[in-house]
């Protein structure tokens, strides 16, 4: 992807974030801005890799706001919840479940930003397997599963909302036949299968505080009459890419992740779309968010939103966020949109961060 001039991006960000004020980000009418803030992230990929991925964004955000922004990757969702709740982080990039638990437990934060992916403010979790015999019919290449008014339906990979493994953006939009340094990427395969078939299987979840990596899938299992603790062998991998790896390497029979986390492996494992088959999906989940401490001045919170929005409008920002979290834009978040997550947690009896 062509990267625009970083200088031009920085200049635009500074103007938008500060409202073209000559005072920069030193202070505002609703309170003095701190000299530095900390932005916490949860690893959806390997922790060390994510730390490297977010650093360019931290540098740009620091320049846009006129204050230092430190990026910190916590070990898991619980670590970020604790960091935000105890004031060790001022901003946090949360999954929807992590946000609702943190807000419920500490109450000293508000949802500021909601991710938008390819025009959608919701997504779903996907069930994956390396065993084609689990499928009701033969897996089909270059397909995906989507929630529709008629229930879960198989669609072409180009028609899926989320960008699927093996799909890339060409000059005319989405296209099949992505190539990486390691070779041509196999388009993702999917099939339909009943969740009742996974009883007794090794299941790779991500984290107990992950919405698509545990909460919604666990609720699905209960609704299917399967105990997510005793009727399967649960494995917590710590990340969405790690869950895909577990299925790919046959360390688990089944795995769950966001749609389509298989893309995170495509540069090293070009056949991941063939070997890891999507066979079911969860109901729709509100996209992840950035929550901000209520101790931050309102003007700073607004400037943060504007700066992130502007950065995503640059080629560099688009590339960084797509590679790290798959975000293509953002919108103002509304807390009530996450009631569906709270209801799912209540159904499972989860009222505080796990771990």
Task: List where the protein language model places each region.
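A local structural motif
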Residues: 62-73, 88, 160, 164-183, ...
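A ligand-binding cleft/hinge motif common to bilobed small-molecule-binding domains
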Residues: 96-107, 217-223, 248-249, 253-274
């Amino acid at each position: 992807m062509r990267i625009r001039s970083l200088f031009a991006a920085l200049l635009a960000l500074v103007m938008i974030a500060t409202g073209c004020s000559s005072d920069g980000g030193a202070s505002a009418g609703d309170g003095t801005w701190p000299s530095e803030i900390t932005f916490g992230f949860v690893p959806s990929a390997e922790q060390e890799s994510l730390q490297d991925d977010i650093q360019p964004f931290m540098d740009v955000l620091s320049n846009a706001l006129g204050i230092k922004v430190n990026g910190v990757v916590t070990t898991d969702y619980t670590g970020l919840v604790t960091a935000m709740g105890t004031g060790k982080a001022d901003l946090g990039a949360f999954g929807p479940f992590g946000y609702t638990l943190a807000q419920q437990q500490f109450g000293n934060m508000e949802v500021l930003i909601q991710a938008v992916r390819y025009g959608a403010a919701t997504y779903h979790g996907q069930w994956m397997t390396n065993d084609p015999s689990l499928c009701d019919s033969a897996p089909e290449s270059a397909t995906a599963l989507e929630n529709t008014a008629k229930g879960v339906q198989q669609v072409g990979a180009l028609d899926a909302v989320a960008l699927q493994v093996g799909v890339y953006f060409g000059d005319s939009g989405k296209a099949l036949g992505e190539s990486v340094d390691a070779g041509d990427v196999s388009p993702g395969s999917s099939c339909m299968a009943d969740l009742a078939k996974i009883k007794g299987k090794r299941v790779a979840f991500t984290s107990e505080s992950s919405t698509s990596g545990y909460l919604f899938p666990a609720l699905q299992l209960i609704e299917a009459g399967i105990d997510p603790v005793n009727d399967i062998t649960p494995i917590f991998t710590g990340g969405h890419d790690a869950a895909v790896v577990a299925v790919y390497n046959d360390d688990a029979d089944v795995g769950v992740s966001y749609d389509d986390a298989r893309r995170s492996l495509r540069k090293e494992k070009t056949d991941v779309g063939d070997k890891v088959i999507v066979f079911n999906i969860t109901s729709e989940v509100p996209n992840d968010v950035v929550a901000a401490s209520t101790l931050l001045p309102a003007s700073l919170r607004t400037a943060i939103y504007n700066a992130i929005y502007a950065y995503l409008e640059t080629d560099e920002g688009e590339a960084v966020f797509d590679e790290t979290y798959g975000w293509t834009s953002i919108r103002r978040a509304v807390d009530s949109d996450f009631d569906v997550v709270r209801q799912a947690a209540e159904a499972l009896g989860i009222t505080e961060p796990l771990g």
